[in-house]
């Protein structure tokens, strides 16, 4: 019989929790590793709606990307996700920055969804020695606006923001989520565009000033691409367990 700890160990082999960034809170964040598992729900975030969905389908475990406990808890109320996890005796494993960095993880899945070839490291996370950003080539060059539309369609976004770089886009860098800190200089990196989930105003100005096409596609959309990969890997490793992506796993924002 599969236990929570077996799924934790599998994820730890793929994306070691020891490689998570220092600010992170990844790992088994709720529940008992010895509990048996027949049904697992996958989600980007463990929201109250996700926990309620897990309870309704009889799941014993939720595997998420974002930690259900990140900032210090200041209150625990009946409508909060941690309370609901405890109430329904549902365990939570959260694979965050360790899954961003892992081969086959979030950034790899984002590169695949964008159709990039010759995918390789763009920059390295010093503590882990793993790539924090990747780059690769498009099949053919695109003008900046055309590339932004390509990203929008590939990630099924309602909208994207972008800066118009000074050159057609063939080589693309990327870092999922809040990854604008990895934004490269096109003159030294050979990258004409960079895709991420979030960027601050001054980062958009910086991209424009160096002639980089910066495409901001939304935190959720640049990271949710990993959920099918997690489901596929876990389903192959544990065929006796049912893995499904939560219907309640969605972006909280809307575009008008």
Question: Which role does the model predict for each range below?
Answer:
Residues 1-256:
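Hydrophobic structural segments
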